[in-house]
Structures are given as C-alpha cells and as structure tokens.
Amino acid sequence: MRARCGRILSDSERVEADMDTGMGGMDFGTVDAVAGQVAGNLAVSEATIADLGYLRAQLAAAEVPFLLVRDRDHRLVLAADAAHRAMVRRVTAAAAAAGFVCTQPQPDVVRLGRDRDPAHHVELELWEYHGDTVECPRPNALTRTVFDLADVEFTEVRLFDRSWPTLAQMFAPQPTDVGFDIDIVFSWVDGSDPEFRARRAGMMAQVVVGEGDDADARIRQIDELKYALRSVHKNAPWIRRIFIATDSPAPAWLAEHPKVTIVRAIDHFSDTSGLPTFNSHAVESQLQHIEGLSEHFLYSNDDMFFARPVRPSMFFTPAGISRFIEADVRIGPGRNNERRSGYENAARVNRALLAERFGHVITRHLEHTPVPLRRSVLREMEEEFAADFARTRTSRFRAATDISVTNSLYHYYALLTGRAVPQEAARVAYVDTTSRAGLAVLDDIAAHRDLDFFCLNDGSFPEISESERVREVSRFLAGYFPDPAPWERVSAPSRRPLPESTAGAA
C-alpha cells in the first residue's frame, strides 16, 4: 500500500492523537510548531477543529493516508491519496450518517461539516500520484495543481495540540500573514438599568441634543453584545483580548474570563472631570488610553457582527496599514448645527478639520462595521487636534461640535498620512431593525451567509412596536449565533425589558 500522501495512525495514536512515527519508508520525524501568526491567519473556529479531529480519526481507522494542507485562502484541507477513493467514500458516507452536511463543490473535492455555516466546514481533496508527479484538484498555499514529488519534503506540523502530516513550508509564515496581536474594544451601555436611565434623563434635561439623540434607540439593548462576542469567538478567533468600555453593571450572562475585560471610563479617560458621560464620541476619543490594549486593535459597537470567518488581513496589512470601508452614503453639504443628529454633525466637524489640515474634502460616511485603529496614531491625533479631543472628551451628550474619532476622523487622517487605505473587498449590510423592510431581510442574511459583517441598527423613528422588534431580532441572533462563547455563564437572568415604545415615536 502506498503512503505517499501521508501516513496511517496506529490504534494508540488514534487515542492519543500523537503522530510521531513514520510509515512506508517516509520520514515524518520533524515536527514544526505553527507560529502564532500563522495560526492566527488561519482563522479556524472550534467547530472546524472538532470536525477536523473527527475526519482525521475516520481516515486513520480506514487506513487512508492524508496530509493537512493550507489552501490559497488559508482554509484547512485534508488531502487524501486518491488510490483510496473507495475508502474515502465510506468515510464521507459515515460522516453524513453522523450528521455532517456533505457537498461537492468540484470534482475530487468534498466539503463536510456539522456547523450550519458552510464557511466552518472542512474540505477533503483527493490527490493523484502518478509515478514521480502529484496532481491536485486545486493549487494550495505551497504547490501548483501538478508538482514533482522530488520537490517536496514530508514533515509534520504541530497544530491544535496535535501533530499532523504535511509538506515542509506548507505552514511557514508568509509575507502576507499578519504577525502582530490584535485586540477589540466594544462600547456598550445597558439601557435597561433603572439607575442609568434616571441619571441620563436628569442630566439630559439640562442640555440641547440633536435630532434622534435623545431616543431610547441610543441605549436600548436586547443582549446584542452577547451575540456580538459570540461572533468574535467563532469568526475572528485570532483576536487576542476583548475590552468592553462601559460604566454599566457587567451583563448577567458574562462570567469572569481572562480574554474579556470590563473597562470603566474613570480608568481610561485622560481627564475625568467631565464624567459621567453618556456620549459615545467621548468614549471613542479615549480608547488609546486603555491599559493593556494592543497597538493594533479593532473598535466596534454591540450591534455590529462578524458574519463569517474573517482573517486579520481584512483589517490590516502585514506592515500595519489599516484598511477601512467607505459607505456609498455621502455626508452631504452644509455645516454642523444643533438641528442635525450627533452622527451627521460629527462627520461635518471631521470634514472641516481634515480640510484645514490637509486641503482634502471628505465626502463619504464609513460603513457600520468593526474598524481598525492604532494606538500610536490616535495619540498623535490627540496632540494634533488637542482642543477638539478635549472638547469632545468633556461633552456628556452628543454635541454639534463633537468629533467622531472612529468614524471617520481617524481613517482619513491615517490615509492622508500614509497609515491607512480604503478597501472594497468586504461584503457588509446595514439593517434598520425598526423598519419592516429591515426585518424582512434578516431571513435572507441567515439563509445566504455571504456577508462578512452586518449591523442591526435600532432606528430612532420606529415603524414597528418594540416587542415585535425584540422578538424578531432575538430570534435571528439566536439562530445565527447559537453556540455560547466560553465566557458565558451556563444560565443567567433575563434582561430587564425597556418600556414599550410606540410606533413612530422618537
């Protein structure tokens, strides 16, 4: 029997998952540990790892030699020797009987998985060995579709606490791999907390706010944060740490976990004289002062979700250049004034600052997605626009003179100073969940799963009742992200409901 495409596990190896002997005269004595940056760029979820382990055991039991391969999109592939085609069919049939969904995207390629999202399934290829050459159904990270056997070296790679047969350099760091740590910061507020609502209402009565900025939509929450964090765990597992910037009590479902940290404003505002704040613009102007935050990080709101597996290169180049996503929506003419929303005003303040500094006029908003930032650039901006940062930092509510650092001041400043570029590869959707048209697209998003990100925004001028919105959004999120993250409590009290909103009310 040939063993060109890998080797067979012994009975003890199937139990221990420890592949440290050779077979068929092939030397698998070298075990290369996958560098952290390579493992991160693979963006492999727990669901995928579990299915890889299952298929590995089944192939070993069927005595089918195989290799672990990284494809051109950094997806993991099991490459089996086509001489064992009949046994591979038995393995896939057994997987289907065990609950795997099996599809065949092209000849000699089978996709298998138990997750409802095919992006987390494992692909199994059949490689043909013709004397001194090997033919693959597709190119991969290392080889073309046809290569000489003499040009490759068989080895093992340590990945997911196991050793896997592979080809030398298959998992070596590549110039396009992002090799630095990336954290994420979420801003969040529990609008159902009675103490918070009373304090906010009392202080808001003393100020003038823009259109829609006093609406409950600014603070409503139906556990979106729980699902946003689930989306990180599943679709961006390379993120090192999660910070939640909030002065609300920790959500009941959140347990102590080394990867998740609650950050209070008093601990990261450079000047605390303006606290408490109810202004997300103020919070966003102080992210660079969060202790322990990585140089490169993402910022997100609790209504933004990672919809499918994404790699670090979605946000940064290997050189650390950030990649941001412009929206088709134009900022529009006119200056900031108290009649506009805080969102629209901040875009105009940003535009004026950048025009004065660089002589360029920005015209577009950014998409509602997680955005990449660098602490060093933020600190530089805080010095460059010191008065604007200070004014926004001390603004308790959104004001007509606020800057919006994360949308879009940072990104265009970084672009105009050579530290950012726009990108058009991401597929995104913005959904107003208080509109009937918005709710109507949720099932399509779940069915197609072809987006990288989606935002489920809570509009300030609803067409539907709050109870209907809560029911439909909760149903959608529970179906899209059903698997708890490791930082969730086994059971937690239900959230406190907000007072019912009347359709059409602000």
Curated annotation (Swiss-Prot):
Region (Disordered): 484-506
Family of the protein in this entry: Belongs to the stealth family.
Organism: Nocardia farcinica (strain IFM 10152)
Pfam family of the protein (one): Stealth_CR3
Annotated EC: 2.7.-.-
GO molecular function annotation: transferase activity, transferring phosphorus-containing groups
One annotated GO biological process: polysaccharide biosynthetic process
InterPro entries associated with the record: Stealth, Stealth_CR1, Stealth_CR2, Stealth_CR3, Stealth_CR4
Other information: Stealth proteins are part of a protein family that is conserved from bacteria to higher eukaryotes. Family members were first identified in microbes as proteins that help pathogens to elude the host innate immune system. Microbial stealth proteins are involved in the biosynthesis of exopolysaccharides. Stealth proteins are predicted to function as hexose-1-phosphoryltransferases.
Keywords of the record: Exopolysaccharide synthesis, Transferase
Protein name: Exopolysaccharide phosphotransferase NFA_48680
